[in-house]
Amino acid sequence: KVAVLRQSIRDFQTQKALLTVPYTRTSHKQFEYKTIELEMDRPMKVIDQQIYDRAAKSGFPRNFFQESYFDHVTLYCMPDNANCNFSHFSDCSFHVCRLYGVKFWDTRLYGCEFHSCRIEFTLFPDSTLANTHFRDCSIHSAAFLRSRMTRCNTVDCSVGRLNFNGARLDGCTYGRITRLPNSRIEGLEDASITMGGATQEEVRYNRNAIFHALGEQDPEHPPASRDRPPGPER
């Protein structure tokens, strides 16, 4: 058991060292996919673990990640600037994966986890994230423009630039966050932060906790002003 554990640690360290190295394999080979229609007249390619592993080994074909249904897949590599627009990720894990310039436009991520990932210039506009968590990730820059996030947790992550303009955070939590140099949080004060079924006091507490975890001051709850004591009479 000790030998297995040591090998697992070595494999993890090897994979993590590759986070700064772009994935560059390409392929013109197309796979035979099953299709599924979750919306009328919008068929999606069904990607399982076997198809993903084969593509990762030989090189991802064009539009592999776009308009695709990923079902219980562990993703450990992606090409830079991958296009995941209009795709659906169900119970997937992004494990020690480099995401650089990846686009999740109008994408669904249900029950997913980003674990020990390096995330840079990645966009989630108009996407839905439910029960999707970020753990031990380095999030250098990401935008959740108009994203709908439900019960999503971000824990033990370092963050640089985040944009929450127009986002809706319902029952989301942030904890043990480290701010990177030159970091900036945008749009958080205008995001809709709610908790379904919670009291107004619980919602206020959660909102304050999110701002505090991200190192931001909530404009709705500015710090109490302290009156300066009067100076001595002259």
What are these regions, as identified by a protein language model?
Residues 4-222:
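Tandem repeat scaffolds
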